[in-house]
Amino acid sequence: MALPGTIVQIMWAACLRCGLGVCLVWGGFWGFASEPSSAASADFNQPTIQSLLQNHCVSCHGGVKKRGGFSVVSLEPMLGKGDSDVPILVPGKPEASLLWHRVQTEDVSQRMPPEDQPPLTTEEVHLMERWIQEGAHWPLHWAFEPPKPGSQRSSQLHPVDARILEVLNQKGMEPSEPAAPTVLLRRLYLDLTGLLPSSDQWSRHLDMLSRGDVHSVVDQILASPHFGERWARHWLDQARYADSLGYEKDSVKKDAWQYRDWVVQAFNADIPFDRFSALQLAGDLIDPENPQALLATKIHLQTQFNLEGGIDAEEDRVKRVIDRVNMVGATWLGITVGCAQCHDHPYDPFSQSDYYHLMAFFNNVDEEASFLHRVPDEAQLESVMMERRRLQDQLETMLQRQLTDKSLNNQVVGQLVKLFQYDQNKGLTRHMRERSQQRRATHVLIRGDFRRPNLALGNMEPAVPAIGKFLPSPPNHVDRRFLAEWLFSENHPLTARVFINKVWGHLLGQPLVETPQDFGSRAQEPVHRELLDWMSSWWMDQGRWSLKELIRMIVTSKTYQQSSNHRPHLSQVDPQNRFFARQNRFRVEAEVLRDIALQMSGLLDLRIGGPAVFPPMPEVVIQQSYSRYHHPSQGGDRYRRGLYTFFRRTAPDPNLMVFDCPDASASQALRGSSNNPLQALAILNNEVFHEAAQSLAQRLWNDSDLKTDHQRLTRLFEWGFGRAPSEKEADMILPLLAATRAYTGEHPDQLSALQASDLSEMDQASERAAWVALARLILNLDAFITRE
């Protein structure tokens, strides 16, 4: 419901005068965290031969085109002759190398790069000559080298801070001052639980922070059951989780939520990341009798399913397998393996054959339905199985009756329908299972077309790609268990780095490696590479792959705890804050924004787990879906956390999407953070935020201890920010309240736009309406929607 125009004008004019700013107005002076640059725009100004070849040669001699019959993606293809009789590269002999002749010839028709491409500079030509003369050494890409722990640092410094400070000192920079205790506590709660501290937590934990007991505060927050919800949302972005199947029909996945709940429980239990990952990759092989292990494999069922008429079932199956391969590459390897589906990777040493060897791990996996849901003990499991056997016996009896007595046909058919509609939520769920018979052959698909298998290359057996020099000896029988073991081998160069980079991005506002889903040869080496390598080595060894230990290590550092305040000098020397001389300031995610608004208003239902719920959604969006099914939940379900909101792929909640929620079509490592006018309008006019503002105003009026405007304003700030408003803030906001109060008193016809029906019957309705308007403004403040 929209606010009356005049009230909006009063509220915004006052905000502009006071400088508090709503989401639409500037988003704060320093703004949001810098967006990671794309792989295509990575900086290759380093004086290396690889960057020279990537910049000038790979477009014609990469994994796609391979003109002249050779590629410059790696050294080996250049050591042959390609389509010519002259070797492309002869280490130590530039004069015998075709590559050298082509870059330095005066013949324009022969010179490379061609005329329509930027030419090599004199320095670059000399670099290539010197490189060949010195033996054509090809250094390994930094991300393909195993992490090195580096040298020991002073034990007096936090290990994260010691490595950050070393780089800052080299650059002549200093870290920022510590954040205010209220800012730090709010930051910790938003980062670790996605919620605000309660009144008791504000009081108790601020007292602990004042005594310097940060570790105990962190431990208590990590122990919250809401930790699992917060970090499950991050993981579900990578798992491309949704509650519907996609495509035109976009039918409901009735059991999708069971995987989501498994992830929440796994993070709360702090299952080590290697075990957490292995169960998702191969739970049906690792522990086939364990219902929880089978539930974990539902990550592979987050693909889209096409239920349209007339489709080719095999084409749809292959698309799902390909989606799983690409998800594994993005989530665990941080490599764009999908580029090799149709041809060799354009710029990474990852061939098309490598892709289909990887695909072979998943090509013999089928979906299976079993009774798995909520079976905490053997007694309940046996009860479910007995019921299943009873129903099977009943079904067989009815079938026999149907065969012998035609007069019972209608009755039997009706009974059969009832049996087949047996409540699926009582245990039946889909999961993955490796097929043991009639196994499918995996072939390289020409141009990625499932109808064009390259039979000449033979069957692609399951195999892992060589990453750098890391290629362990496979066992006799290779399956998804080996894939999981390979990913978490001691010397694997990517798995720990890739995940830690994303965790750092969630906690510091931007990752150490700017391309979190592409650690390939175009990924810039991070300025804090030694920190990334040290954390990777520490996490695998001492941290035991524990997510909570990793988070504890980061958030107890001074680097995490420093202020995010703007510093003019830093904006000149490090505008993107790549060196982390300050914290980053950014808008909270879509779900968190809704959650904290409902929490502050007292409406938020904090129940954990269960089927998806249906908050109010615009009818015009509902009509976009094929089924047009969306009946708003009632009672507490209407105000559950955003994690539990039903997500339909073809008609997602626009209030999620306007705040950069991913569309679940592909794995998303880190969300973007945009700033646009629609966001302010969504908060101002969305039905849920309107109800939150009404409830927040009512919550203030229900507190009999609050007698004055200043006391109520103070309580608002205490709930939202853990502090009282400053004198300047109060002087700016209270006149706004007075102006709104005067307007509502003079225009009683507009009270219904601000009040719930129960409020309109109260005395002093215009007074309460003014507080509803102010509550809506507070929920739209940049300070409220921003994590500092």
Can you describe what each PLM-predicted range is?
Residues 1-14:
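N-terminal secretory signal peptides that target proteins for export/translocation
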Residues 13-31:
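Bacterial N-terminal signal peptides
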Residues 32-166, 182-187, 197-202, 244-245, ...:
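Solvent-exposed helix-loop boundary motif
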Residues 113, 247, 269, 297-443:
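Active-site histidine-acidic residue metal-binding/catalytic motifs
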Residues 155-186, 191-192, 196-226, 241-288, ...:
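Primarily short, surface-exposed interaction patches in extracytoplasmic proteins
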Residues 774:
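Short, surface-exposed polybasic-aromatic patches that bind anionic ligands, especially phosphate groups
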